[in-house]
Amino acid sequence: GRVSVGGSPATAVVLGVTALYPPGRRPDLVISGINHGSNAGALLALSGTVSAALAGTVLVDPPIPGFAVNAARAVADEPIDSVANRAQLDAVARDATNLIAAHRNWFCDGGRVVRPRTVLNVNYPGLPVSQLKGTRMTRQGSASDLSIVFEQTAASEYTARARRVEATDDRDSD
């Protein structure tokens, strides 16, 4: 059946794992996404997609590893539900499923979770999946190309404003 949760993506994961799954039948992996856009660097702190994948590793006992999937639009100036962007999401879903299957033994060995406090955050660029040259493991960077501030716009109202800034980080980070 379907369940609706009035909370964050991370809250939904914790509720699902601790209360909705039958006792003794917990998942081996928390999969979150597909998020529209990239989640990298310092902006991970704002990501519901990554937080949901992370929730199983830090808020559930015993911990469950996580896998977050993010994808840039195939055509940036078209709506998310355009034909090209829907095709991109379908291709990313198939590829991410294959990626998870290929790395299943990295997370689990003989049905036993061996990396319970691990989250993999996968970012797909806005290219056709068929043009990708493979995957590469990196570490989380600390740079962000956005600066976010909240400005008061009325007596009890604040509006987020973002501006682009130059970001530099190690070459081998996200």
PLM segments and residue spans:
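Extracytoplasmic/secreted envelope proteins and their assembly/folding machinery
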Residues: A10, V14, D28, V50-A53, ...
